[in-house]
Amino acid sequence: MYSQIKNTKGEKLYIFTIVNTNSIKPYIYVNTWEKCLKKFEECTKELDNDSFFAQIIHKNISEETHTAEASMRCNNKGWGCDYFSYITINSLYTEA
């Protein structure tokens, strides 16, 4: 049987992950749904300025199941080819 991990305040925890095709090290952040969702919104903003380009390909947030996923096309202008980011939020479980 699996149960969702909770912090010391009794709040359920979620794992926020970013994986880029140009990096072997994923970014991982664990916190409550609200804080992970805030970070998700910050990381999925479309940008097009002198140094960076980011375009959303797919973005889906499910408040009902507390999951989120997004795919983005990115480019550090002047520093090579495009790369892709895959961003997710999922529940964090442990074996009980």
Please describe what each predicted stretch is.
Residues 2, 45-96:
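Short, mixed-charge low-complexity intrinsically disordered segments
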Residues 6-12, 35-38, 77, 95:
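Intrinsically disordered, low-complexity polyampholyte segments enriched for Lys and acidic residues
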Residues 4-24:
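Short aromatic-glycine-(Arg/Gly/Cys) micro-motifs in beta-strand/loop hairpins
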Residues 34-37, 41-44, 57-58:
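Residue-level detector of alpha-helical secondary structure
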Residues 22-35:
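A short, exposed loop/beta-hairpin motif centered on an aromatic-Gly-Thr core
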